[in-house]
């Protein structure tokens, strides 16, 4: 029997999750029963069908009253601002995928559970008091039935954690720095406008904009031994999708470029197949749009200095890759038991 899910928040990630479910052929395993979103039903249907990053949705989409029709499937639409008022019990929801970007605390998760959901998966980093933070492919096997309120971490954490794990096991990481070169997001204005972060008052399409990031904290959340040993910075660039991450790590064991690339390529074809990919083609960011992997290593950009400093460039579709991991983690949560 398919897992019954509800999507709370139908923005970039919420819509990508729904599209990824249909495109990946996993509807026999996961059924979207309801979507809660404050926007109009007409707008929800339109943006599902037509997407500036991912193109037209292949399935027929129409909206009638409080229902969204996707092919032959009927999804109930809800427009409720209070989690406590959501009808998850009535709808028999197994897992809520909270893609709102607003909620992420233990209290928020408990509110979903109190409304009748068996489990909750946040599509962004949560607090330390959540039951688990999952990077699929690295620690999803640690999920237990009692883990009711879970975070899927962030798109950048999902991108870089598998690479860090591989390099650490092989060569022993001492410390590292990460620079995220991230596409612009909907918290940036089209033209200059007020924002509490003065850099984000500036037009997204006109500048490379440094922003705060909690990626270093995300790394230590998964690997506590790296506490105070990683630092991260982030810049937003004038593209609408796809992100690159520049990872530099100092390692204990001497190594060369060929060895690093061989390690990462082998992992992409083996243990991390479907999660990590590897390429040496002369590609640019748009070539990774709609790529379902969490991370794509660009082997042409690997560098090693003094045998102990490794630099890698890793791409990801920060929407599509993450949406696919949301589905993977949902299935892992269900497999762990309710």
Swiss-Prot record:
One Gene Ontology term from the biological process aspect of the record: pyridoxine biosynthetic process
Reaction equations catalysed: D-erythrose 4-phosphate + NAD(+) + H2O = 4-phospho-D-erythronate + NADH + 2 H(+)
Coiled-coil annotated spans: none
GO cellular component entries: cytosol
Leading EC class: oxidoreductase
PROSITE patterns: GAPDH (PS00071)
Assigned EC number: 1.2.1.72
Residues flagged as site, Activates thiol group during catalysis: 182
Sequence positions that bind NAD(+): 12-13, 318
Binding site residues for substrate: 154-156, 200, 213-214, 236
Record-stated family: Belongs to the glyceraldehyde-3-phosphate dehydrogenase family. Epd subfamily.
Subunit structure: Homotetramer.
Name of the protein this chain belongs to: D-erythrose-4-phosphate dehydrogenase
Gene (name only): epd
């Amino acid at each position: 029997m398919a897992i019954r899910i509800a999507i709370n928040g139908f923005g970039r990630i919420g819509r990508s999750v729904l599209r990824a479910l249909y495109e990946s052929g996993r509807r026999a395993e996961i059924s979207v029963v309801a979507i809660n979103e404050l926007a109009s039903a007409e707008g929800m249907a339109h943006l599902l069908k037509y997407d500036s990053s991912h193109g037209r949705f292949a399935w027929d989409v129409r909206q009638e009253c409080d229902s969204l029709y996707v092919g032959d499937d009927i999804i109930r639409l809800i427009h409720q601002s209070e989690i406590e008022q959501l009808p998850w019990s009535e709808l028999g929801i197994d897992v809520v995928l909270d893609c709102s970007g607003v909620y992420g605390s233990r209290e928020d998760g408990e509110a979903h559970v109190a409304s009748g959901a068996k489990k909750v998966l946040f599509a962004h980093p949560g607090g330390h008091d959540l039951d688990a933070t999952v990077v699929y492919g690295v620690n999803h096997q640690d999920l237990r039935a009692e883990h009711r309120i879970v975070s899927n971490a962030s798109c950048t954490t999902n991108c870089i954690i598998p690479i860090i794990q591989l390099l650490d096991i092989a060569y022993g990481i001492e410390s590292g720095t990460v620079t995220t070169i991230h596409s612009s997001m909907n918290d940036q204005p089209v033209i200059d406008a007020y924002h509490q972060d003065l850099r984000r008052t500036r037009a997204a399409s006109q500048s490379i904009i440094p922003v705060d990031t909690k990626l270093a904290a995300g790394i230590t959340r998964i690997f506590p031994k790296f506490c105070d040993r990683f630092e991260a910075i982030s810049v937003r660039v004038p593209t609408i999708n796809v992100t690159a991450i520049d990872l530099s790590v100092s390692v204990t064991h001497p190594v060369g470029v060929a060895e690093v690339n061989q390690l990462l390529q082998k992992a992409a074809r083996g243990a991390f197949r479907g999660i990590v990919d590897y390429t040496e083609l002369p590609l640019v960011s748009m070539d990774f749009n709609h790529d379902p992997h969490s991370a794509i290593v660009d082997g042409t950009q690997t560098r090693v200095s003094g045998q102990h400093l490794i630099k890698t460039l890793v791409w990801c579709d920060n929407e599509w890759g993450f949406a696919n991991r949301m589905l993977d983690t949902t299935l892992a949560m269900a497999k762990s038991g309710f």
